[in-house]
């Protein structure tokens, strides 16, 4: 049996980021062959990651990376808020975002590129990790805003940096779905209109009054779901359109990501339960 030296264990730790005892065990099993040990650890890690894949990963972080004219927004998920704050998890998420920006990768290419690193992180941390979404935003002028690490926004348009930054903050808080009322898709408008017509008819209003009510309610609806039609959070008596006009600014597009959107979350765990879950693996 080959001797497993401390130097060999140290090298394996540096190359895999695995724990000391795990590295020693792998080297003993591989009879001191570090390349075989790494191969075996990767196979073991892939098996563990496959078992974790069914676990709901609805926590995590939103990362934003920017360079001239382009920004990348990334969502990386884990199972618990405890792990979402882990330095290793955040380092992984930041590296993925940097590569997404530098290489302009879509989500499929990004997931493929980082699959080995993801498996290694799952093995180390003991939770399911998912590279869920990436959005690339281009524009003449860009502004970004992150609310903690849970919400991220990038706004593209024209105007002063401070103005666009405030618009990004508004998007984070108010969750508009479209830039302008006219951008609301026809099918969405028709669906809402049908609802409002039924409501008006059920209220027993005369047809002429009901039609006017529906027109008013639809104008309100398209305003509420669009950025420029919303009341500006910092000056509620004005709309975002008013603010943009005053500042000589405009918005062409925006992207807002929030951790866990659309994912059905499991019952919330206490902090103690989260720690216990991480320790159990």
Curated annotation (Swiss-Prot):
Cellular component terms (Gene Ontology): cytoplasm
Keywords, comma-separated and alphabetical: Cytoplasm, Elongation factor, Protein biosynthesis
Family assignment from sequence similarity: Belongs to the EF-Ts family.
Region Involved in Mg(2+) ion dislocation from EF-Tu, annotated ranges: 80-83
Protein name: Elongation factor Ts
Domain of life: Bacteria
Localization in the cell: Cytoplasm
Function: Associates with the EF-Tu.GDP complex and induces the exchange of GDP to GTP. It remains bound to the aminoacyl-tRNA.EF-Tu.GTP complex up to the GTP hydrolysis stage on the ribosome.
Keyword field contains Protein biosynthesis: yes
Major localization class: cytoplasm
Coiled coil: none
A matching Pfam family: EF_TS
Molecular functions per Gene Ontology: translation elongation factor activity
Species this chain originates from: Vibrio atlanticus (strain LGP32) (Vibrio splendidus (strain Mel32))
Keyword Magnesium: no
